[in-house]
């Protein structure tokens, strides 16, 4: 049934280990703001607050996949129309023209799980935004993990909140951590008196302390720690900020521990391989009684429900680090409360250019404010650490492009901005590639849309721009990379993607 409200009574369940489940939904308040650590029952609480059709937004592909599975598992028998929206803006970049295909499907579903980029059209009046708004008005919009967005995306999310509020949506914001300045702005837009504001008491927060922090100058300093952890059959997670670093470290691990179960996971895999790796990570590594090592990038920060014993990580912005730490000692049971596990943080690089994709100053400040020497990271102090690193939110002015300014729509009805300002703002220059084999064998051309998606490797256009690669005119217009540049264990190696590495032995028809 289109436009049917879902039956979400399942989420009224209560459990002592999930303090948020013990708090009742205040029906007199239209909106919600929940600030609580991972594992406190945030998802259940946000859904419990909904009264109509639900749009559940999360920042990353991996997280929307995981959330979709979870809701399907929880509500499968009660709700017939739960939909997953993959990246809606399939950008076709060719002849320097950027076109945006807004996929207007899955209209009127009871529950949709998606990324906020897919709703951003309403802040910018990109083609198709009227029907998106029509679908959204009067619904419940959950904006979860809101702390993980970049500055620009935060500005866009604020604008979206303003528009959604204007069209009668109930807005439910969930976050583990958030700079106070940003929280204040959100509450101002929604109107404090309209918001059920929920955070845990210091007493309860103390039960969420789970990590002891150690600092190190370089990865090599931690090799003895790694050795000991492997001997003790620990599950080890190593997190890097860049794919190339992760690939280098994975090679070291392969040399050092040829017999230990290990995996590399990052964004530059064929989507089919990435899905397989995510499943293995959850179903095999996560439950392994023996030593295993997973080397990853930011893809593990959010919503991959894994719980390891020890982490070695490069310094990231403090809010992202707190997310990362959530993958260690995550499972809360009566036994694990009060038991702590170690996290080792590697100092940020000296050179600013090596700090990319992050701001060097933010990295240095984040490293500085964290404890050291095995000291406990206290949940009650996280807010002050974050405020030290981000004393104020930098306001980005997106009103120039926005369609909705000061409570008024700026566009004439059904007229849209011809070129999406959003793409330039978000610097979404994501394109896909496929391997030479998937091209030459005709596999990609003959495949249907779903099969094609599984062959595609997402990359940034800027990293392929000068490589003179062949580009197909079908599907997502993928670039073709040499077979030698890809392996199902390591993903895409950008250093080998030049056209000079094409295999010329494929039969020329």
What are these regions (language model features)?
Residues 84-95, 243-244, 263-278, 297-301:
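Conserved helicase motor
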Residues 53-64, 229-254, 264:
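Conserved strand-helix element at the start of the C-terminal RecA-like helicase core
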Residues 28-49:
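Walker A/P-loop
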Residues 131-140, 146-202:
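Post-DEXD/H (motif II) to motif III coupling segment of the RecA-like Helicase ATP-binding lobe
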Residues 79-125:
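Inter-Walker segment of RecA-like/P-loop motor cores
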Residues 51-74, 86-89, 180-183:
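Conserved Walker A/P-loop ATP-binding site and its immediately adjacent core
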Residues 180-230:
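Interdomain hinge/linker at the junction between the two RecA-like core domains of SF2 helicases
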Residues 183, 231, 248-283, 313-509:
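C-terminal helicase lobe and adjacent C-terminal extensions/tails of nucleic-acid helicase motors
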